[in-house]
């Protein structure tokens, strides 16, 4: 009975440790992913028989020569994500050391030199260490997402953030993006490259059986965490 209790306790501890070893990843895109434009202050309208005044901030009027690119809270910008990163590192080291020493006992008190030779002492040592290491990583991220201006900074830069979700089969995929856009980098198509966005944060996450298949099993994670090798 005691053995069964110990086995049950060990199994429970194993499951608890395995469940706690891999916490869900923390999001890197912080804050809201959208914003609505503020309501304009409506001044009393002076409408005549032909002329009908429309508030410029209501979205019903835009000047003929007004810039159509995003510049206010609530405006949208299309981000073209084209991220290509590659990094590699290689190190090597070598240490070699050797030494030897021999001590002999001279003839003493007429003793046989053959006997004295047995009392000679010699020692030698050698130490050698070689190490090599190399690692590399390559990442490609290509996507398109339309984000919303959530804040206009004092210098005119635009803080943008957005999210796009897609339900594919039995899983869900989501793309999140946030950063600071310089309005001068926005082209006439109201798009900007992700490489021109400051403080860019990009996420691509998924749920479902495809995402679960990419994760290591809990038992494998447990043995990997306790293995000394």
From Swiss-Prot:
Gene Ontology BP annotations: bacterial-type flagellum-dependent cell motility
Topology in membrane: Lipid-anchor
Lipid-bearing positions (N-palmitoyl cysteine): 19
Major localization class: membrane
Gene Ontology molecular function: cytoskeletal motor activity
Keywords, alphabetical: Bacterial flagellum, Cell outer membrane, Lipoprotein, Membrane, Palmitate, Plasmid, Signal
Stretch forming the signal peptide: 1-18
GO annotations of cellular component type: bacterial-type flagellum basal body, distal rod, L ring; cell outer membrane
PROSITE patterns given in the database record: PROKAR_LIPOPROTEIN
Protein localization: Cell outer membrane; Bacterial flagellum basal body
Quaternary assembly: The basal body constitutes a major portion of the flagellar organelle and consists of four rings (L,P,S, and M) mounted on a central rod.
Role this protein plays: Assembles around the rod to form the L-ring and probably protects the motor/basal body from shearing forces during rotation.
HAMAP family: FlgH
Family from the record: Belongs to the FlgH family.
Protein name: Flagellar L-ring protein
Gene: flgH
